Design a protein with these regions (language model features):
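Polytopic transmembrane helical bundles with strong interfacial aromatic enrichment
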Residues: 1-140
Length: 140
């Protein structure tokens, strides 16, 4: 078995939730800007599914990261900074997805402004998490 398998798995899985959370924020934010109902509904529906798929994608990313680090929850140096962003980001994204999935109305309804702000915070956190993960790979 490839000794770097879990590092490769982590690298392969982390990009989906990063992209989908950023995309969800962009879509729902854009949904607030459009006055045409059909356009708004399409954007909010895509934002809904992007968030749910992004949250689902966090699970293999977190599991592969934990296996790769042999269960180290914080670590030292850059790994510690990465994990200090990763754990709250993971919890926030899963919580936001549950909030959206259990919310009233259909998938294409306008989410609350509070929800969109929370997704914006998650987008910033997932970006910071990815940045510090990249710093470990680049080795700076």
């Amino acid at each position: 078995m490839d000794k770097d398998l879990w590092a490769k798995m982590h690298g392969a899985t982390v990009h989906f939730p990063i992209a989908l959370v950023l995309f969800s924020f962009t879509l729902d934010g854009a949904g607030y800007a459009f006055s045409k109902l059909a356009m708004r509904r399409g954007l909010h529906s895509a934002g809904y599914w992007s968030m749910l798929l992004g949250a689902a994608g966090t699970v293999p990313a977190v599991v592969s990261g934990l296996v790769m680090t042999k269960g180290v929850l914080l670590g030292h140096d850059t790994l510690r900074v990465h994990h200090l962003f990763a754990w709250p980001t993971f919890a926030l994204i899963v919580g936001i997805a549950i909030w959206r999935a259990l919310g009233r109305g259909s998938t294409n309804e306008r989410p609350s402004l509070g929800y969109v702000v929370a997704v914006g915070i998650a987008a910033v956190l997932v970006s910071a998490t990815g940045y510090w993960g990249g710093e470990m790979v680049v080795g700076r």
